[in-house]
Amino acid sequence: MAYREIHAKWKADPEGFWLDAAGAIDWVSKPTHALNASRAPLYEWFTDASVNTCWNAVDRHVLAGRGKQPAIIHDSPVTGTKHTITYAELQDRVARLAGALKAKGLI
């Protein structure tokens, strides 16, 4: 889809456009409204929905067999070093951090 076509679709139905775009991620509970402008200029997106960000950013990639693929790449031009963290490694690190936060009563 070309830029003009995407822009025209957004212009014709902004609410529908963003709800369609929201379909690209997995939701715990799907949104029925895209933009909440009731407190403008403090806008809120997808206020009637719930999402697990870790699932969308990490877990689903491991489940899909991409655990050994890079999730984060740090390539430092200053030190000349490159460090990669795979999706599986990131999942483990996130789980350990969540466990530590829970043990401290923070979550």
Identify the residue ranges that each predicted region occupies.
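Conserved catalytic residues of ABC-type ATPase nucleotide-binding domains
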Residues: 38
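Extended carbohydrate-recognition surfaces in non-catalytic/accessory domains of CAZymes
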Residues: 44, 48
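Adenylate-forming
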Residues: 4-9
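A short N-terminal helical cap/helix-turn-helix that marks the beginning
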Residues: 11, 16-32, 49-73
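Conserved AMP-binding/adenylate-forming core of the ANL superfamily
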Residues: 54, 72-107
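Terminal domain-initiation and capping elements
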Residues: 33-34, 42
